[in-house]
Amino acid sequence: MTATWKGRLGMSVAAVKDLTMTIAYDLKASVRTIPDYPKPGILFRDITTLLGDARSFRCAIDELVQPWAGSKIDKVAGIEARGFIIGGAIAHQVSSGFVPIRKKGKLPHTTVSMSYALEYGSDIIEMHVDAIKPGERVILVDDLIATGGTAEGAIKLLRQTGAEIVAACFIIDLPELGGAAKIRDMGVPVRALMEFEGH
């Protein structure tokens, strides 16, 4: 059974889209920027202020979901940790299951894993081996895409299970760092609600 926005929100897809476009400018303003965190020269984009404002959070989730309203989505996979918050809300909205993608050693059952590149070195992400069945349609979610290393690893991990990756969704894209372009080059559509310059 596939839910539609009308069933979830009590209004048509067009009405929701008009509403979110009307207040979309608020979303970027609701993200707090913290200079020199976690190190000098970095502008940290803090989405906890967006998540803490009910109107902004609702608008962000509605806007991220909009392209798949009425579509069959089997699972939403969220990257630890803020991807859990956003992904859980999206999974609820599209009436799908939710799959956590976690750092190595955090899941209790048998896992599949994938190594991915960091700025300096590498790390490993995992998910339960039985979390996704071959052919299931999956949306990948995280809060922000910068260099795209973690998202790239997550896509490879999902493909290892036979998932069909419908899209990768983010609240924020830092386009100068090239992550979204890298994901598109992997054949995965990218949806981001806003862009910020720099890193």
Swiss-Prot record:
Q: What GO MF annotations does this protein's record show? A: adenine binding; adenine phosphoribosyltransferase activity; AMP binding
UniProt cross-references to InterPro entries, sorted A to Z: Ade_phspho_trans, PRibTrfase_dom, PRTase-like, UPRTase/APRTase
Q: What is its EC number?
A: 2.4.2.7
**What subcellular compartments does it reside in?**
Cytoplasm
Q: Which GO terms describe its biological process?
A: adenine salvage; AMP salvage; purine ribonucleoside salvage
Question: Looking at the record's lineage, which domain of life comes first?
Answer: Bacteria
> Carries keyword Transferase?
yes
Q: Which GO terms describe its cellular component?
A: cytoplasm
Q: Does the keyword Cytoplasm apply?
A: yes
Pfam families the UniProt entry points to: Pribosyltran (PF00156)
Q: Which UniProt keywords apply?
A: Cytoplasm, Glycosyltransferase, Purine salvage, Transferase
Biological pathway: Purine metabolism; AMP biosynthesis via salvage pathway; AMP from adenine: step 1/1
Predominantly, its location class is: cytoplasm
Listed under catalytic activity are: AMP + diphosphate = 5-phospho-alpha-D-ribose 1-diphosphate + adenine
- EC class: transferase
Please report which protein family the annotation says this sequence is part of: Belongs to the purine/pyrimidine phosphoribosyltransferase family.
Please name the PANTHER family in this protein's record.
ADENINE PHOSPHORIBOSYLTRANSFERASE (PTHR32315:SF3)
Oligomeric form and interacting partners = Homodimer.
Q: What does this protein do?
A: Catalyzes a salvage reaction resulting in the formation of AMP, that is energically less costly than de novo synthesis.
State the protein's name: Adenine phosphoribosyltransferase
Q: Which gene encodes it?
A: apt
